[in-house]
Amino acid sequence: MATAATSPALKRLDLRDPAALFETHGAEEIRGLERQVRAEIEHKKEELRQMVGERYRDLIEAADTIGQMRRCAVGLVDAVKATDQYCARLRQAGSAAPRPPRAQQPQQPSQEKFYSMAAQIKLLLEIPEKIWSSMEASQCLHATQLYLLCCHLHSLLQLDSSSSRYSPVLSRFPILIRQVAAASHFRSTILHESKMLLKCQGVSDQAVAEALCSIMLLEESSPRQALTDFLLARKATIQKLLNQPHHGAGIKAQICSLVELLATTLKQAHALFYTLPEGLLPDPALPCGLLFSTLETITGQHPAGKGTGVLQEEMKLCSWFKHLPASIVEFQPTLRTLAHPISQEYLKDTLQKWIHMCNEDIKNGITNLLMYVKSMKGLAGIRDAMWELLTNESTNHSWDVLCRRLLEKPLLFWEDMMQQLFLDRLQTLTKEGFDSISSSSKELLVSALQELESSTSNSPSNKHIHFEYNMSLFLWSESPNDLPSDAAWVSVANRGQFASSGLSMKAQAISPCVQNFCSALDSKLKVKLDDLLAYLPSDDSSLPKDVSPTQAKSSAFDRYADAGTVQEMLRTQSVACIKHIVDCIRAELQSIEEGVQGQQDALNSAKLHSVLFMARLCQSLGELCPHLKQCILGKSESSEKPAREFRALRKQGKVKTQEIIPTQAKWQEVKEVLLQQSVMGYQVWSSAVVKVLIHGFTQSLLLDDAGSVLATATSWDELEIQEEAESGSSVTSKIRLPAQPSWYVQSFLFSLCQEINRVGGHALPKVTLQEMLKSCMVQVVAAYEKLSEEKQIKKEGAFPVTQNRALQLLYDLRYLNIVLTAKGDEVKSGRSKPDSRIEKVTDHLEALIDPFDLDVFTPHLNSNLHRLVQRTSVLFGLVTGTENQLAPRSSTFNSQEPHNILPLASSQIRFGLLPLSMTSTRKAKSTRNIETKAQVVPPARSTAGDPTVPGSLFRQLVSEEDNTSAPSLFKLGWLSSMTK
């Protein structure tokens, strides 16, 4: 409906012009407008009814009241006029009547007494109004003086209710009965207002002194009782302040108000109750004895005329003031007991007891208040506000003098009352924060493991999950995040501390799932660390040891005196959090290890992928969580440069073990725990891999039928040798020796290398690789021992071990021994010690070969082994060991066959299977050799294009043409810096 959308102004315009209304609207629209207008009229009527019913009734009542007041006022005016006229007639009649002169003298004393009594009654009637005015102006002492004057008037006029005598004044003036009853309530009211004023925080010293004087005059108490009343009132104020409703940000104001109240109480206690010893001159900055001077002013007799201050200023202009008796004009309140000054010893003991009594309330109250502070930044804000408040107090020299006079020692608000409470709350917040991080990390770990176990390598649901199954897919996949956006113009040295590129993650074989977990953990640690750093000094220069004596003296307290305790607290909770995560990982690994032990297809089990994830996670936590390092080492000690310098000094032997910083030792301990757990995870994986591969290797080795032996045989080299015949002539003969290991040996090594590279072997811990190779070698020797035992027991149909097969077995065993033996221990010991088991198997195999032939074959066999190891150093890169790969070439290098060997780079590289030329002199020959091989290999290109096929990368490298003019990518400094 168009009418409903029109504005009210348009509606009113249409209604004013009926002709235009009927021209622009139809019948239905006009009916709608009519209904709308009628509804608006009803709404206005309802509003008018409400206004009349609620507001107009009040107006009528107010008008009636005003009219009644007007009539009363007119009546009062008429009565006053009539009284005035009547008095005037009386005066005229009195002046007209003659008086005998004798009666004038005796009537003067009685007339003066009458005027005096009338003036007293007049004053008595006006005192209540004066008392209320004084109470409204918070002048309790003046109200007390008026009240005591009122009591004095009662006694003079014999108005006391306790008096048994007949009171002629009350009988003639009944209004005084009500006045006496009203005056009886003034005492409790003045006492209540005075005690409430004592509880107020922002009251001047003079006002507190007057309030105490009022209490002492009304209760007839001593100065010691006044001190007790003052301290109890302030204790009640402290309790009220601590029990106020809590509103988060108001807690800082509450605590600061509490500290300010304590300081103000001590100042006012000194100003009111402390008296200087004889001989000491008063200090204008430190007033004292104010209570006693005020009492002397109110009750003392000197100087003369002081007491007239109660009435003189207010009543001296009245005509009846001159008729008041002297006892009223010069009235001064009195104390029943003398106000003796309080001794310093009593004042000190009383204040110390009061502070001790308030200390428990303050601790409980502050503890409850701090429960509402949910961040360490909030705690730091409260502490800093207290520091600023107390520093402003302590800058005044009088504060120290005041504390020495009252307590004989400084009052340490922060150290004695607040610091431990803040530390306890800080510890609670830290523990709660890291417990939350631990629980959330455990939930994230369980979720990641469930996702890994529920997904399979064939499901395309999550590409990142596939990288956990096969790290090579992640390593050789391209991503926009591989290089930082500023990699071309920002060097590594100028890059941020926490900046890392995708290539850096790939170089360390850190999968996206591990990156996400570490990023989530590090972000939580960063939030907690940033929150805690607000409580600590911003830099080392703010630490207590660097604060100048002048600054320390002017400060109320050292804000960062507990920085070491807070950092130790943070360190302890951080280590506990990481150990909790490690314990969760250890429990998961143990359960998976028990489940994987009995499985035959363990390599395809999703449980094993979870093991690899947890092993990589433990290996990467220390590097990908830089804020964990900051939590343990501190902000200043966690930088990379000092750590590098420390390691350099350790290598040079300039730093002794005893000189290691405890925080560094704690960080090393955490790294050792993570590395140990990572090694345990990799050990579960390596045990499963070795078990499966050795099982296949042993089955192939023990096959003794002729077909199996021929199927596993490889080509042999044919060599010509010259021998001296019995006649002395040289005889040339040909011998055949194995040049390659058996197919099952090559398959075993290639499968082992493939499994290692599948999990990112270049980033595996060295000890894991060594233990894995050692385990493989032990199992291989066990397989050969089993073969020897079976051959010693002759079976029907079994293929005998010929000399050629014995040569091949011996060649395989020696090759496996060279490849699988870790070189690190041999280099350290200087010379490798032969394994007795290997020697025993070798002797058994050599016994199957003719001794004369063995002597002839051995040198050539060793030469073939040496060439084979060098040729396969790239294909079996990580299996052969980095110590052997990266060693410099010996002088016995055969210059006739440089193209048969493809050495690795002379420095440690990130990817173990990446082939590089070693020298420029061999580059051309190596390139020609690759080109020659590339012409033979093209039929295999169909499989090289599939990155999932094992060994496809190596086939791709040897099948593509190499550009000899292009330098190696890893020799370009700017590109190598991008990968860091």
UniProtKB/Swiss-Prot annotation:
Annotated Pfam families: VPS51_Exo84_N (PF08700)
Alphabetized PANTHER family for the sequence: CONSERVED OLIGOMERIC GOLGI COMPLEX SUBUNIT 1
Gene name of this polypeptide: COG1
Modified positions (N-acetylalanine) in chain numbering: A2
Domain of life, per lineage: Eukaryota
Organism phylogeny: Eukaryota, Metazoa, Chordata, Craniata, Vertebrata
One CC-aspect GO term: Golgi membrane
Subcellular location: Golgi apparatus membrane
One BP annotation, GO: intra-Golgi vesicle-mediated transport
InterPro entries assigned to the protein according to its UniProt record, in alphabetical order: COG1 (IPR033370)
Bilayer topology annotation: Peripheral membrane protein
Subunit structure: Component of the conserved oligomeric Golgi complex which is composed of eight different subunits and is required for normal Golgi morphology and localization.
Keywords, comma-separated and alphabetical: Acetylation, Congenital disorder of glycosylation, Golgi apparatus, Membrane, Phosphoprotein, Protein transport, Transport
Described purpose of this protein according to its UniProt entry: Required for normal Golgi function.
Residue positions, PTM Phosphoserine: S7
Name of the featured protein: Conserved oligomeric Golgi complex subunit 1
Coarse class of the protein's main subcellular location: Golgi
Record family assignment: Belongs to the COG1 family.
Disease cited in the entry: Congenital disorder of glycosylation 2G: A multisystem disorder caused by a defect in glycoprotein biosynthesis and characterized by under-glycosylated serum glycoproteins. Congenital disorders of glycosylation result in a wide variety of clinical features, such as defects in the nervous system development, psychomotor retardation, dysmorphic features, hypotonia, coagulation disorders, and immunodeficiency. The broad spectrum of features reflects the critical role of N-glycoproteins during embryonic development, differentiation, and maintenance of cell functions.
